[in-house]
Amino acid sequence: MYVGALHPDLADPVADAFAGVLPELSGVAGDRAAAVRFGKRWQAHRGGQATETRGTRLHKLTEFTPLTAGAGHPRLMTSAEIDLVAGWARDGFPEELGSQRREWAERQLEQQTMWIWEVGGVPVCMVGCRVPLFGVSRVGPVYTPPEWRRRGFAGALTSQVSAGIVAGGNQACLYTDLDNATSNKIYRRIGYRPVADFVDVVLG
């Protein structure tokens, strides 16, 4: 169940309402304060545990600062890189796309929403973005193969993609893993600032 940005004070009455009609509820996701409070209230009704698991943080670009890398340049993905992008998606976030990785990569090509950082003719990193909706575009996914990490490529490419979003008259946002201090630090250097934390709470 997704509670979104529900005000924490409303979490209790919402949990009260669902406890009697949806006893099989296995989890809740949304704003951290609301989801955690919902979980505690659910425990009071149904017993069991309410365990906070995956946490993400929403960031908004407020003051843009460009980042650069020691080598390479950004460009859009090409049709010859559909399998490459699909393979990187498999390696970087295997649970999110399942068997639809190639179709997803083809869609990025069609929408021109996947960027590649290239060094000496070799693709070393990818950063995507969403088609703007209501003036907002979300940056991601971001993936660098292990052998090309710690060289500033992801930060530089994220910076370039973010700049393009802003140049198009849209706002840029992105999500990060709460436990990934490195990426949170890099995005802060670009000018992203936290807006809200979201978590999954497993009920059982």
What are these regions (language model features)?
Residues 29-35, 174-184, 201-204:
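Conserved beta-strand-loop-alpha-helix junction that forms the acyl-donor binding cleft
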Residues 44-50, 188-197:
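Conserved acetyl-CoA-binding loop of GNAT-fold acetyltransferases
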